[in-house]
Each structure stands twice: as C-alpha cells, then as structure tokens.
C-alpha cells in the first residue's frame, strides 16, 4: 500500500508536469506534448485526487484552466470565467457523459448541439453598442491578455454589429476561436521558407503566435480567421433558448461559425455525427481535433451547472490517434532533474499526426522490455493532436538478425556515477545527485526558488549565463559568486546594480530555517511538508544526516520508499561535500529551543473562502506550524473547515458530512491560544 508521502510525491510530480506543459501550450505557444498525452497526465492526477481527496494539493491544476498571461500585454479579468472542457475518447465515455446528464435531468428531453472542436486560440470579444472595444485571450481562465489591436486586424471578425432584423445589444461578450485555415497556413510557411524565415509547426502555433505580436501589422499580414462558439454576456438579455439558436443569432450579427453544426435528439445521433465528421476531417478548411458536444437547452445548462474547471453540460469528443511505421536507428539515455534515466528512441524521421517525428521517449527500462524494442526494429509510432508521440507496437518479424536486447547502463552517461534502481521501482536513477551536471540546472532552480532559499533575482537567465561561464558546478558555488564579480559584470545586460542586487539576495538567503534548507536540497520525495516534519522530528541537520532508515520511517509523512531516498542522499559522499561547503559559506538557522508543540499533528484541515485578516497562504502556514495537514478538498477524514466569505461548495460538503466549521473570528480565537 502506498504511503501518504509517496502519494503526495506522485501528485506533486504530476502537478509540476502539467504546469510545465500548460506554460508551453498557453503562454509560449509551443506545445511540448500532444492533447492525448496531456489528458493522460490530467486524468492520472484527477484519479489520485478522487481516491485520496484529503491529500489534494492546494495548487492542483484540476481547479484551474490554462496558463498565466504574458506580461507584455495588459491583463484583463474575465467577468465570466473562460472554462475548459472535459474530454471523452470513445463511445463508452460519450454514453457515460450522457448518463450523468440524464441522472441530473430526470424525465426531461435532452437535445445536443454538436460543433467542430477547432484547434486554435480561444478569445473573448467585447462589444459596446455594437462596436468592438476589447479582445482578450483565455489566459488562465480567470484573467487573460488584452489583444484588442491584433484582433481588429482579423478580416472576418465584425468590428461593428449591424443587422436590420436583429437589435444590437448595449453590451455583448462573444466567445470564439482564432485559427489559421489550412490553405493560409501553407501559404504563410511557403512564404517564410522562401525568405529564409522561421516556419510554424502547425496552424495553431501560427495563429497563437500571430495574436501575441506587439506590432498589429504582423497580425494583419497573417491569414487569421475567427469563428464564434458562444455568448458569455448580453445586455439586455437576448431571450434565446438554446445554443443552436444562439449561434444562428450570432451569424445574423455578422459572425462566422464553424462550417459544421448538428442538432441531435439522442446521444446515438451524436456518435453518428462524430463518425461522419471523422471521415470528412481531411477535407475541412480548418484543423480540428475532435467535436464539442453541448446540451442545447440553455435552461438545462443552468440546471446542470459547473465543476471547478469545466461545465457539466459540455464535453470534447477527441479523435483517435494517428499511427505510422518507421525504424529505430538508436536508443540512448537522457538524465533528468531528479537523476531519472529516460531511454529515448532515435527514429528514422516519419510524418505522423501532422508533424515529423524523429525522437520518442521509451519512459524506462521496464517499458523497453515490455515492448521488446531494439535498435533496428520496425515500430508503429502513435501521435494524436499535439500529444508526445510514443511507440505503440514493435514488429519483430522485421527485426535484424543481430539486434541486441537493450540493457540498463551501469553508469550515468553524464557524470559516470553508478546507476541505481531500487527493487520494485520502474525508474533507474543516477546516484550523482548534486554532483551530476545533467541534474545541476534544475537542482539550482529548485534551490533558489521562493519556497526554498528564496534567492530573488537568480532566475533562469542568470543561471544559464553562470553555467556557461562555468561558475556554477553545484548549488554551493552560488555562495562563492562574489569572488567572480568582474566576470559577472561581463554578462550581457548585467550591470553593477544587477550584480549588487544579486549579491545582496545571496547574502540575505544565508539566514533560513532548517525546514527550508532540507526542502532546498531537492531530495527525492521530500516536499515542503515532509521537510518540515523532518526538521521538527530531528531538530538538527546532524541528527538527520545520522538517522537510519528505521528512524526516518517513524517521521510523520515519510513512507518506506521516501525514507530510503533520504538515507541514500546523505550516504552519498559528494552530497555531503556540497552540504559542508554550504554550511561553511555561512548558511545558518536558529538552533531549536525546545521541541515544537504540534497539537494538531496528523489532523486534516481545509481553508476555504476569503479571509479578511490574513490570506489563505498565511492561514495554511499557521495550521501547518501546529502540525495539521492542510488539504484542498473536504472528505470524511477532514477534522475542521475554516470558512471565510464565499466559501461555496466546500462549506456545503462539510455541513453535509457534519464536519466542524469555524468562521474567521472563531479561527483567530483558536490560533490565539497557541500564540504564547
């Protein structure tokens, strides 16, 4: 049975991966994985949270949408959040979606509005008295970027709403998708290639990149198109009763909608539409990656309501992946931040899923053996949408006679440290830790992060420059950068003031806490909570370094596997060398005066709503200091819920489960008794 710490570690890993891919997709317009691969990560996290709701992390992306807005455009708050959609991938999932709706709307006739799922960039358009006044990207669903000047250059997008048979609303907010039709995309890439300029990987990247140009003239030169898919706000209310009517009304105002739209009276008809569009997909003028199914009746939509990040009344029905055959030319090993060795198949380039694929991750040695993939093999490569491609099938009948079974390397390909793979684990790791160059940059990023040593200003640009100058071989070198001041001044855009600010931040970081220091070391499986538990239990770094596995296992929040990871970390000689150098550089923390009182040790608490006297982060920290585990969701294991203003569904669930609830004043009084 998995220990809570291991479950949390798995959740944290998924959250970090999803955040990374959200940033690549929504902010950088450079998707790093396909939609199917992203969906798999997302569903893994949702499944863990459903099974262990008390361990749900506060920053889980299952309660958010998309990525953060870029700083170069003005940030705009959406009055009505721009939510994403849930996904279904087959007929069974589709019928389950319909059953959930029917259970919530018993004895009601349900019609479904079915539309193309356009592969573009979602935006919101604001009209006042029929005049376009603002265009905003979806961003993180709550806030987006003001791209008004760029959207005004889109040729088919109405700047003035006028129609003799339709009264123009005082205010109208229309949601839709900006994309680049296939022919326009091909012409743009051909022109760029002829001029020796960068070409785009796919139409979505081209559309998103065009909208985020600071110069509207660039957007104007691109063949962009806008297709409306819904109304967010309308004053006075439009009085329409269905999605189908809403879209037709928008066309009367001058908006274009996707070239296919269906009104289905049963979920079986929806499936038939899906199969029809799948056949017609190659002939469509635009790229699509599935279909969107919505309950057509707007009143029924209101009855069904929303989950935290998606409507209950709509879902996206994704198309299946595409497959192509190619040859494995080589298999090599890459080393990640935590030392994980990942085998990568180098392929004879093959066009699949709209892109040319030449590299595919094989994940781990177990997957290699499961597939029995070898150098020289013919393989089927699977790719759907923007999902990272993968090897789906090996064809042994085409295997070369001398093809050898792939073995796990005994030494790290980067630093030559021994490779270890504990019994029962799927992943092999370099044991080099802080010594390994491949792990170095991510280890440094983690070490300087806000929740670790919090060295303000030591961002990626600094780190990359310092690595290039060979001034950072490990995290301890950070505290010797003052010895290289003249070299630092040679870095582009790093003047005297920037260098001094960095020196000041490094000096300030020397005063920390034992818990922060333990967390900063980046020991596998040791997050903030575990680091705090280790600090409270062992009180000193020396005691932690000398602890055996049995002592570590007795620490709250530390399971058997994490205990072994901690023990192995402090057993590695090169890690101890780095620790000694950090301490010699002056990193210190207050000595423990007495064992920390933790009256809430082991209890699960939830903080929800808005608190007037403190933020939720501070409330969480106060509870954690008393030993509580602060969860993002309410379950039968929850001890107490602290409810501020607009507490919402968590308060409702707590009352339903008869869990103790404190208002803000009661919570402050509760904390006061431990403030002496």
Swiss-Prot record:
Reactions mediated catalytically: NAD(+) + (deoxyribonucleotide)n-3'-hydroxyl + 5'-phospho-(deoxyribonucleotide)m = (deoxyribonucleotide)n+m + AMP + beta-nicotinamide D-nucleotide
* Domain of life per record: Bacteria
Query: Which residues are noted in the entry as Zn(2+)-binding?
Result: 412, 415, 430, 436
Q: Which SMART domains match?
A: BRCT (SM00292), HhH1 (SM00278), LIGANc (SM00532)
**Pfam families (UniProt xref):** BRCT, DNA_ligase_aden, DNA_ligase_OB, DNA_ligase_ZBD, HHH_2, Nlig-Ia
Presence of keyword DNA repair: yes
Q: Does the keyword Transmembrane apply?
A: no
GO cellular component terms attached to this protein's record = cytosol
Q: Which residues form the BRCT domain?
A: 595-676
What does the record give as EC number? 6.5.1.2
Mind telling me which InterPro entries this protein's record contains?
Answer: BRCT_dom, BRCT_dom_sf, DisA/LigA_HHH, DNA_ligase, DNA_ligase_AS, DNA_ligase_CS, DNAligase_adenylation, DNAligase_N
N-terminal signal peptide = none
The record's comment on protein family reads: Belongs to the NAD-dependent DNA ligase family. LigA subfamily.
Biological function: DNA ligase that catalyzes the formation of phosphodiester linkages between 5'-phosphoryl and 3'-hydroxyl groups in double-stranded DNA using NAD as a coenzyme and as the energy source for the reaction. It is essential for DNA replication and repair of damaged DNA.
Give the protein name, as stated in the record: DNA ligase
């Amino acid at each position: 049975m998995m220990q809570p710490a291991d479950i949390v570690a798995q959740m944290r890993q998924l959250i970090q991966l999803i955040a990374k891919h959200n940033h690549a997709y929504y902010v950088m317009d450079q998707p790093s994985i396909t939609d199917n691969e992203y969906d798999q990560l997302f569903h893994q996290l949702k499944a863990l949270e459903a099974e262990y709701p008390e361990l749900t992390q506060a920053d889980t992306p299952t309660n958010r949408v998309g990525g953060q807005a870029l700083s170069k455009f003005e940030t705009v708050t959406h009055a009505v959040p721009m939510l994403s959609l849930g996904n279904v991938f087959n007929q069974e999932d589709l019928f389950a979606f319909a059953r959930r709706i029917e259970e919530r709307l018993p004895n009601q006739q349900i019609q479904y509005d079915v539309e193309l799922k356009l592969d573009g960039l979602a935006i919101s358009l604001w009209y006042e008295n029929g005049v376009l006044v603002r265009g905003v990207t979806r961003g993180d669903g709550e806030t987006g970027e003001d791209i008004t000047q760029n959207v005004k250059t889109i040729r088919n997008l109405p700047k003035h709403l006028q129609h003799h048979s339709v009264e123009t609303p005082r205010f109208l907010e229309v949601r839709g998708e900006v994309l680049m039709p296939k022919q326009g995309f091909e012409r743009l890439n051909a022109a760029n290639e002829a001029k020796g300029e960068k070409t785009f990987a796919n139409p979505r990247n081209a559309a998103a990149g065009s909208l985020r140009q600071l110069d509207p003239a660039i957007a104007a030169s691109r063949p962009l198109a806008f297709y409306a898919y819904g109304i967010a706000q309308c004053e006075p209310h439009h009085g329409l009763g269905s999605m189908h009517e809403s879209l037709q009304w928008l066309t009367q105002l001058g908006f274009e909608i996707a070239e296919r739209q269906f009104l289905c009276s049963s979920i079986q008809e929806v499936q038939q539409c899906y199969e029809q569009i799948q056949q017609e997909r190659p002939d469509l003028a635009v790229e699509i990656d599935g279909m969107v199914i919505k309950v057509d009746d707007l009143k029924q939509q209101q009855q069904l309501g929303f989950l935290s990040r998606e409507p209950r009344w709509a879902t996206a029905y994704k198309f299946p992946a595409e497959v192509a055959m190619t040859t494995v030319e080589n298999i090599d090993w890459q080393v990640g931040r935590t030392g994980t060795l990942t085998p990568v198949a180098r392929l004879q380039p093959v066009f699949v899923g709209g892109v040319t694929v030449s590299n595919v991750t094989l994940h781990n040695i177990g997957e290699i053996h499961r597939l029995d993939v070898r150098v020289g093999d013919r393989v089927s490569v699977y790719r759907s949408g923007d999902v990272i491609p993968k090897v789906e099938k090996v064809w042994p009948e085409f295997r070369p006679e001398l093809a050898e079974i792939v073995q796990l390397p005994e030494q790290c390909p980067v630093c030559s440290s021994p490779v270890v793979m504990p019994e029962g684990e799927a992943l092999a790791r370099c044991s080099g830790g802080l010594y390994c160059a491949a792990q170095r940059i991510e280890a440094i990023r983690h070490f300087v992060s806000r929740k670790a040593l919090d060295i303000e200003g030591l961002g990626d640009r600094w780190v990359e420059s310092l690595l290039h100058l060979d001034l950072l071989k490990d995290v301890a070198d950070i505290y010797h950068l003052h010895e290289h001041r003249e070299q630092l001044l040679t870095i582009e855009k790093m003047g005297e003031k920037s260098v001094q600010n960095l020196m000041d931040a490094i000096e300030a970081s020397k005063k920390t806490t034992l818990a922060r220091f333990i967390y900063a070391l980046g020991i596998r499986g040791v997050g903030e909570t575990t680091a705090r538990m280790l600090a409270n239990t062992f009180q000193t770094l020396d005691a932690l370094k000398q602890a055996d596995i049995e002592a570590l296992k007795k620490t709250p929040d530390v399971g058997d596997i994490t205990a072994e990871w901690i023990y192995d970390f402090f057993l590695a000689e090169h890690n101890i060398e780095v620790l000694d150098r950090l301490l010699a550089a002056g990193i210190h923390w207050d000595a423990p005066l007495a064992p920390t009182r933790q009256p809430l040790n082991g209890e699960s608490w939830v903080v929800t709503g808005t608190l007037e006297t403190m933020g939720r982060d501070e409330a969480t920290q106060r509870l954690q200091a008393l030993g509580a585990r602060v969860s993002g969701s309410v379950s039968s294991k929850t001890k107490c819920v602290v409810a501020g203003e607009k507490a919402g569904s968590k308060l409702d669930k707590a009352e339903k489960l008869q869990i103790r609830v404190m208002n803000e004043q009661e919570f402050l009084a509760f904390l006061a008794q431990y403030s002496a």
